[in-house]
Amino acid sequence: LRTLYVSGEESSRQLKLRADRLSHDNPNCFILCETHLEQIFTQAANIQPDLMIIDSIQTIFTEVVESSPGSVSQVRECSAAILKYAKESGVPVLLIGHINKEGSIAGPKVLEHIVDTVLQFEGDQHYMYRILRSIKNRFGSTAELGIYEMRQNGLREVSNPSELLLTQNHEGLSGVAIAAAIEGVRPFLIETQALVSSAVYGTPQRSATGFDLRRMNMLLAVLEKRAGFKLIQKD
């Protein structure tokens, strides 16, 4: 598969260091460090790739628009030109973009509308696991979820994520429960831990990690009202 990887953020030397670390040597992978869209199309016409990857769309600019790369007008015009190229050539194009603090795709909404599929790759700074979610899929279901582990030699698929979530044996301990949950079409076994103690100060402290605090307070209110639990003076 002839792949053209367009890097607008990293130099060829940086990409070479990463390829050496991963022991990756593919003669069909072509690297182009360029941000000028017209030059990218020229090189693509010479290479004739089967797949093009652009990293990232916020760094690409076109001469048609007189504004800086990453602006709304530049992202909109570059995306439209890339869409036209993909349709005329039949070459799939993978656009890599940034997300804002709210978790949405940075830039104009038209970028999300013109593409066929939107995949969000997210991770946790404390763990080596990465989650790939399908936000939009014009030709399939969005109820898909992929879990990967970042290792020294690259990403590797996690075939049994429940085994990672249940790393310890807490049999016989109070306050620990294991339940089955579904994310998309994939079942998971997750572990929930709860700790209740008498409040030392006047106002009980309620905190949650990995769970919505407002939802937890609602569940506590249901337990208090309907199940007879006395949780008013409990942390």
Which stretches of residues belong to each language-model region?
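Substrate-engagement module of ASCE P-loop NTPases
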Residues: 73-94, 98, 114-125, 224
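Conserved P-loop NTPase
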Residues: 45-52, 58, 123-213
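Conserved nucleotide-binding/hydrolysis micro-motifs of P-loop NTPases
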Residues: 9-13, 21-24, 35-39, 57-60, ...
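Conserved inter-motif catalytic segment of the P-loop NTP-binding fold
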Residues: 1-81, 225, 233-235
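Short regulatory helix/loop adjacent to the ATP-binding pocket of P-loop NTPases
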Residues: 19-20, 104-114
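Terminal-proximal interaction/regulatory segments of ATP-powered molecular machines
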Residues: 203-235
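Conserved phosphate/pyrophosphate-binding and hydrolysis machinery centered on Walker-type P-loop NTPases
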Residues: 5-9, 34, 50, 68, ...
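Residue-level signature of catalytic and energy-coupling elements of molecular machines
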Residues: 15, 55, 97, 115, ...
